[in-house]
């Protein structure tokens, strides 16, 4: 899917003023802002159809399950400051367009436009990315709410956010399956920023939540050969900018001068995320709060402490599962296929 350029100044003004946004030939009305971070803003929008007979964005969407019945979607606006940021956005669009899986948030459409800055009449670029909307928020949002209420996910829900075992479910497989889809590419892709803030949840009455992994801005081919100190430092610098520190694998903090990096960096992040699903905090931020010291040292040494959880507590087998994923040596850390086999056994043992 190629990037679209045009001089739609009205787009920039509309977003800031709560008006209408055009992505290529489709028009959307800003309803409200959902969030922001860095140079990006996320808005809830509703498609505007001038003629009821027009199908609008629906005709561009390949998977009918991604078509909104009420015309609401999410738009991510990215302010692009320089050519480096422009290339990063283009790469995010390219990578996002590779994936097609029910547990990975799909990019429905996009536009990169040139806009005139009012103050000095100069031009800059902005990107607009269209996605399905999930209004129940992220796993991080839910964890914060549950922590205030001193609530916990059940063992069954914890496992089924990771891996849905009911083959009759439209959302079968969940987080692990989304990661498996990425790792199954040739060459494999790593997400590189798996964390609760990048997992969207949709709650369902009487069922486990639907979990969808989003934000592929850091996703890259997973396998890298490091053969010098310079290459190791370059990887560490890249990781410091693209991989959230509390969920970053040890080999991305302190990379050897001779190393083979692979998709198991994501397994580490998955282990941290599973811990966070259980306790509402990442393992090494919790350890840091308990003992102080350095986040990097806590991660490199895999210092895991267990918070007070629900009553009755989570089973020891679940703790062992987390510890298995948080092996500091990547060569002995499991692959996603191993994770799926193991979590299926846990689900059959502990799910209701």
Give residue ranges: language-model regions.
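Protein kinase glycine-rich loop
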Residues: 31-38, 42
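Short beta-strand micro-motifs within the conserved protein kinase catalytic domain, predominantly
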Residues: 106-124
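Juxta-kinase regulatory segment immediately upstream of eukaryotic protein kinase catalytic domains
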Residues: 1-23, 31
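Conserved short submotifs of the Hanks-type protein kinase catalytic core
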Residues: 122-138
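Activation segment/activation loop of eukaryotic-type protein kinase catalytic domains
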Residues: 197-246
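Catalytic-loop of the protein kinase fold
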Residues: 183-203
């Amino acid at each position: 899917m190629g990037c679209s350029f045009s001089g739609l100044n009205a787009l920039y003004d509309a977003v800031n003023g709560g008006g209408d946004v055009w992505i290529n030939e489709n028009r959307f009305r800003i309803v409200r802002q959902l969030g922001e971070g860095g140079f990006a803003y996320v808005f809830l929008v509703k498609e505007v159809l001038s003629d009821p007979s027009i199908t609008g964005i629906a005709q561009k969407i390949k998977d009918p399950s991604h078509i909104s019945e009420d015309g609401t979607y999410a738009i991510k606006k990215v302010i692009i400051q320089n050519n480096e940021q422009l290339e990063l956005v283009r790469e995010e669009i390219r990578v996002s367009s590779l994936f097609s899986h029910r547990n990975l948030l799909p990019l429905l459409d996009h536009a990169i436009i040139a806009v005139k800055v009012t103050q000095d009449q100069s031009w800059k670029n902005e990107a607009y990315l269209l996605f399905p909307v999930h209004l129940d928020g992220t796993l991080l949002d839910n964890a914060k709410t549950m922590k205030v209420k001193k609530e916990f996910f059940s063992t069954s829900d914890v496992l089924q956010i990771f891996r849905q075992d009911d083959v009759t479910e439209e959302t079968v497989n969940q987080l692990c399956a989304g990661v498996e889809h990425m790792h199954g590419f040739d060459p494999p892709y790593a997400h590189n920023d798996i964390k609760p803030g990048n997992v969207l949840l949709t709650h369902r009455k009487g069922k486990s939540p639907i979990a969808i992994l989003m934000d592929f801005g850091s996703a890259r081919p997973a396998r890298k050969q490091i053969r010098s100190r310079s290459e190791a430092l370059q990887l560490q610098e890249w990781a410091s900018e693209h991989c959230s520190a509390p969920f970053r694998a040890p080999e991305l903090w302190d990379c050897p001068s001779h190393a083979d990096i692979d998709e198991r960096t994501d397994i580490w992040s998955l282990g941290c995320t599973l811990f966070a699903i259980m306790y509402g905090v990442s393992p090494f931020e919790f350890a840091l709060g308990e003992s102080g010291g350095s986040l990097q040292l806590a991660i490199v040494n895999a210092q895991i402490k267990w918070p007070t959880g629900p009553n009755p507590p989570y089973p020891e087998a679940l703790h062992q599962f987390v510890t298995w994923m948080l092996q500091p040596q990547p060569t002995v850390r499991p692959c996603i296929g191993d994770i799926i086999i193991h979590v299926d056994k846990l689900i059959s043992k502990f799910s209701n």
